[in-house]
Amino acid sequence: MSELKNDRYLRALLRQPVDVTPVWMMRQAGRYLPEYKATRAVAGDFMSLCKNAELACEVTLQPLRRYALDAAILFSDILTIPDAMGLGLYFETGEGPRFSSPVTCRADVEKLPIPDPEQELGYVMNAVRTIRKNLNGEVPLIGFSGSPWTLATYMVEGGSSKAFTKLKKMMYAEPQTLHLMLDKLADSVTLYLNAQIRAGAQSVMIFDTWGGVLTGRDYLEFSLNYMHKIVDGLLRENDGRRVPVTLFTKGGGQWLEAMAATGCDALGLDWTTDLADARRRVGDRVALQGNMDPSMLYASPARIEQEVAGILEGYGHGNGHVFNLGHGIHQDVPPEHAGAFVEAVHRLSRPYHLG
């Protein structure tokens, strides 16, 4: 594969020296870009876009043409694994993802298969290979998966939820059933991410979107425990380079020490966690990614620049910081504001990396 021209994202994840702080945005390929909307219209619907390697590649590359981003992220969805398990993923207009056959009892869990990433999820690997080829070594490609706990929330609730009552009922009334399910999901995610790495992903990220709804004890038992298992099973080197692993629990700022102890390389932070405090707590063990509030991109470019300056100052001098939003970019953000954000990160971070 072609030589990597810009590796500052990978270097920052491994806490190695960089010239400026690298930056990318969660959901950087998305509905805030008019060219994304046009490509999605060609595909017909969201999953058709994910399953067409050429179109998935096109939307992955679109933000890189506009902005000097330091990484590309695979265009896909966290729910590909439950879909491949036969739960019947579909999207309701205005409702988000739904499953036609949610998991309701132990028998449902027992019959869940562990998908073969090169068969049932082969379309994802085709997208990874196509994107990696078309990136031509410009920037690294990030692969990703949802965490077992987060996947379980959708599989048991049948879609998005605010209170997670069905899953929490299973967790408290039938913990062994949930553990069996999470174990299968951890095995599935490990196979899936390793297949992405073999197909060309140069870094991987585990999105634990809903870990923050748990108590501390339950988070360790039902979420972090299974992410730790995945980290232990991942390929950590490919193509002669370390493959960094980032864990991101939204609302998980109180558990950073435990997360860092999993052996991952970096932690994603949402905007509710103070970056300076996070660095004091775990910065000698892992890199940190984040953490501007995505809603800040509605502000003027001057206000965005001010916020970027404050976050850079919070992290301070030295290595080990990847700038990002604290969650995905909103769909109605002006594209030029995202551009002002990326430009400000590079320009304002340079003094923090001198000497």
UniProtKB/Swiss-Prot annotation:
It is an enzyme of class 4 (lyase). One of its GO terms (molecular function) is uroporphyrinogen decarboxylase activity. Its EC number is 4.1.1.37. Keywords: Cytoplasm, Decarboxylase, Lyase, Porphyrin biosynthesis. It is found in: Cytoplasm. It catalyses: uroporphyrinogen III + 4 H(+) = coproporphyrinogen III + 4 CO2. CDD domains: URO-D. The record marks 77 as: Transition state stabilizer. Catalyzes the decarboxylation of four acetate groups of uroporphyrinogen-III to yield coproporphyrinogen-III. Belongs to the uroporphyrinogen decarboxylase family. PANTHER family: METHYLTETRAHYDROFOLATE:HOMOCYSTEINE METHYLTRANSFERASE RELATED, UROPORPHYRINOGEN DECARBOXYLASE. This is Uroporphyrinogen decarboxylase.
